Amino acid sequence: DKVIKDTCDNFKYNGLDNLKPNKSYLFISNHRDITLDPAFLNLALHKNNFSTVNIAVGSNLMDQKWAADLMRLNKSFIIPRTGISKREIYKSLNNVSEFIYEKLKIDNESIWIAQREGRAKDGMDITDPAILKMIHLVKRKEISVSAFFNQMRVIPISISYEFDPNDLNKALEIYKKKKDGFYKKENREDLESISRGISGFKGSVVLNIGKQINFIHDSYEAAADEITKQISNQFYNHSTNIDAKSIINNKINLSDNNYFSERLKNQPEEVIEIMLNQYANSVL
């Protein structure tokens, strides 16, 4: 609540009537902010007497002890991003799959997981079939893709921020990657992103909770496409999203939007274009 009071104009959420308090769900969400995306969902659930979720986080966030402690306090579990060997990574992912299955089906607890590895720094909310493949690992020989995910009760989540405190950093990262062919993260970069995301001004934040998805096709790609479609359809576009699209389409000038003109002052043309696209890509 303090984060909302200090750094948001408002926080709105819709779709809790799609959930039953005594059921567990697999919430699959678009991903814009490392810690706040699941935190906003947890806040909406908690305020309405639903149980909070177990949160999937990448192992890259565990390098610093305070971040690891914060994540564990938050009912988080680790998804390995690296390992010594392929076999070791496979074993770890199998353990994650087992954990997710047991939480949902035995403990009746819900799970939050992002639709792709890492935040959508380009504003393209596309579900990675590899995420679904990992979740299905433990039962892949017993249950078909569609039957499995129907059992998991998948709920699409869309979160949108009027202002993303990390928008320029994301744009600069994409720019450097394009320019140099690679991007080397500094040691504390993810932690600085977490801090900036929490303390930076976000304006209006909207969280939309969709209806349970009914899967009919037995392929990870088709299931991923369906999740992407649902997340995209219920995404709330703020004035920043709409203005970014209008600037790209030459309907208005950059100077017509105070936020973009201030934020992008003295930035190279390529960075301006990348950051505008980050906001505009959600506008269909």
Where on the chain are the PLM-derived regions?
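Conserved nucleotide-cofactor-binding alpha/beta core module
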Residues: 54-65, 69-82, 86-90
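Membrane-interfacial terminal anchoring regions of lipid-handling membrane enzymes
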Residues: 1-25, 31-54, 59-65, 94-111, ...
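Active-site-proximal binding-pocket segments
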Residues: 115
